[in-house]
Amino acid sequence: MIDDDGYRPNVGIVICNRQGQVMWARRYGQHSWQFPQGGINPGESAEQAMYRELFEEVGLSRKDVRILASTRNWLRYKLPKRLVRWDTKPVCIGQKQKWFLLQLMSADAEINMQTSSTPEFDGWRWVSYWYPVRQVVSFKRDVYRRVMKEFASVVMALQDNTPKPQNSPAYRRKRG
């Protein structure tokens, strides 16, 4: 399903943990990393597509996450000319994306990249919040920057609410 401007509707998923780190996934058989994302099927809402992609790509279900936020607007990126499939109709020149910020509520062990016969990813790791903006493929960088900027206050508030261990330098004990 491609819109009149040549953009394929898509969802992007940022999964964070309680420490404010985000899940960074390695594309299957490649050296490139990105957030989970995928197309919206006809008749499917963006949220329904997000849950479907979440399971297909990283093996998580509704019970494993909670939605913290979604982008206010659709964000677009154009594919480099070398990646456009000019011989298919209609021609897709890029993606328009609705992004979701999720908090992982279950254990890391629930993440499973092998739920599909053709997995999208073959590895993952937790990275610092802004790391993906510098590391993603260049044609997605502006969208990633905008997504992370929009979600930053939510993730930082989540971090601020995480209990600090007593031996942490951030923990201050009142002196009598």
Swiss-Prot record:
Keywords: Hydrolase. PROSITE patterns: NUDIX (PS51462), NUDIX_BOX (PS00893). It is an enzyme of class 3 (hydrolase). Its cofactor is a divalent metal cation. GO terms for molecular function: mRNA 5'-diphosphatase activity. The keyword Chaperone does not apply. Signal peptide: none annotated. Its EC number is 3.6.1.-. GO terms for cellular component: cytoplasm. A motif (Nudix box) lies at residues 38-59. Residues 6-149 form the Nudix hydrolase domain. One of its GO terms (biological process) is mRNA catabolic process. Belongs to the Nudix hydrolase family. RppH subfamily. Accelerates the degradation of transcripts by removing pyrophosphate from the 5'-end of triphosphorylated RNA, leading to a more labile monophosphorylated state that can stimulate subsequent ribonuclease cleavage. This is RNA pyrophosphohydrolase.
